């Protein structure tokens, strides 16, 4: 029996992530298409590049590396905080390799001004002040919306000469970028096989109220006085003993803790949490060790709904996950993730992209302000578009069914159902398209 590596976060209060779907410009190549076009040649070397020029907002780096697929990491310090996150554009040879590179983001790291909570005149603890960390941050280039799980992989070859990072929002000093061979995250079965035979570890217990850094001030510390199960116990005075709350919900927001591992070995991970904000639905978090996801399943750790404090061991249907940790200092991180919503949102974006194409085809005949009483003969002139409308209605129905099965339907599934009904009306009677075109355009924009 493996020993337990316990993070007793004296509670983590979980909240769900926001389901937000919008269409992207389908003229640009998306990341999936980019990956299919560049192949899977693996890079072998880790390379750090320093800027050859910068004006405080745009940084250029000369690329001279062996051909292969790389993960890119930005190494920076924050000068001043004007926004919640750093926004930037990434280009290779003066062009964004795929559409998502036009809207990338990097986190701002916050730390406690003091590791001791201040107290009021009555001896009650007060949540401490958070300040921007002076430490350098190393952030991977990844999907800030959380739809693609893991870091983006970039192919750099003989024709790759220049990498440009344009900071569009935020005030940072970008000292370097690191190119690492693109990592293929293993399944747990492979990860476990590679660690087979390694000895069991000890017990590590850690309270949650003092994360070593967090990427949002929304991840705040507070007092839970519901009982003795949360440590330290709040009896006759207010004690800061819990972290998180209803505002810890934006995709990517994370909290990180340092741990001192007394001996190398296999550890289980147990967390005490409460998650009572999402009307019976569970939520998901991604789990990192030393900034890396140990195996694919850790990208989507599911926390079932629980309005009371509950201990949960990270596990699958076969039992608890066993994490291998070397002796010494490590970091463990929990970050908000979409979980199984990521594929649903990805499919929604595909449908909306197709419907925007449908809209553009229609207005070539009707114009943007069609005459509601005119017969545009759409069924005769663009029958393939009418057929596409029917197919997209079916795809929306399938998405709604998946949302409902995952218990994450809510208002989002209602919006999709209304759009599906409108599409079915258009498919059954194309004469209704022109009078309702403005509403249709609004629904898909």
Each PLM stretch: what is its role?
Residues 23-445:
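Extracytoplasmic
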Residues 2-10:
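Sec-dependent signal peptide recognition
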